[in-house]
A protein has these predicted regions:
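Accessory nucleic acid-recognition modules appended to NTPase machines
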Residues: 1-158, 163
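Arginine/glycine-rich "motif VI" loop of SF2 helicases in the C-terminal RecA-like domain
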Residues: 188-196
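Active-site beta-strand-loop-beta-strand hairpin of nuclease catalytic cores
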Residues: 162-171
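Cofactor-binding loop segments of dinucleotide-utilizing enzymes, especially the Rossmann-like FAD-
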Residues: 148, 203-204
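Short beta-strand-loop-alpha-helix junction that forms the active-site gateway
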Residues: 174-182
């Protein structure tokens, strides 16, 4: 909490209006609603050039992780990213956890004990997403996601994380439970089968394989991602 207070003081020095801090503090709630980060949801008005400057300055502060939508993963992740469609994660998972419960009077060690023992009665999918995002970025990789429609239906699918291994695509999903549901990866793999190196689902269970899909416990994410080749 003391670190967050220092951040707040710094943000106010940069922007006395408080918008800088408002944007930063809104990230956990936006992710909790499974939203992309829409600045209009925070400011409640049409985006201005000044608002865009706030986002740019926030990105430069290195306190957040930008996460861009890719338009065509079959070509290039970086070259086909849409700079107007992005999510934001926090660059520090510890601060993210504290911010999630910052409005509770009992933000203390008990919350972290329950978190580590998987006894916290909340959906923590977005917390694990932020952790994976931080791991990917710590390996000097940019963050991308992909949304696409089934060729035969109007249903949309989303690949939470899209990166590469040996110049081929690696779709990654993360689940906060032991569920093995992976419809999005299945559809993506069918559509881009020749472009894929591996497909991975991080979840709360032991190592498991479902045909070509690698299911791995979340604690193996740092080692798994570190071993990706450029």
């Amino acid at each position: 909490k003391e670190i967050l207070e220092l951040y707040s003081n710094d943000f106010f020095r940069i922007d006395p209006s408080g918008m800088f801090l408002t944007l930063y503090n809104s990230i956990p709630s936006q992710l909790a609603k499974n939203n992309k980060f829409y600045i209009t949801k925070v400011t409640n008005k049409k985006v201005t050039n000044k608002d865009r400057k706030f986002i740019f300055d926030l990105l430069n502060s290195k306190t957040i992780l930008p996460f861009y939508k890719v338009n065509d993963p079959s070509l290039s992740l970086n070259e086909t990213k849409d700079i107007d469609n992005f999510k934001l994660y926090l660059s520090d998972i510890g601060l993210f956890t504290t911010m999630l419960f910052n409005d509770k009077l009992s933000t203390n060690e008990n919350i972290y004990i329950k978190l580590l023992s998987d006894k916290l009665d909340v959906n923590l999918g977005y917390l694990y997403e932020n952790a994976i995002a931080q791991i990917i970025k710590s390996n000097d990789r940019d963050l991308f996601y992909y949304v696409f429609k089934n060729d035969e239906t109007t249903r949309s699918y989303e690949i939470y994380f899209l990166t590469t291994d040996s110049n081929k695509l690696v779709p990654i999903e993360v689940k906060s439970s032991e569920t093995k549901n992976h419809k999005s990866i299945n559809e993506f793999s069918r559509k881009y089968s020749s472009k894929i190196s591996r497909r991975i689902l991080f979840f709360q269970d032991d190592i498991f394989h479902d045909e070509m899909l690698e299911l791995r416990p979340i604690y193996l994410a740092p080692l798994t991602i570190k071993n990706f080749k450029w």
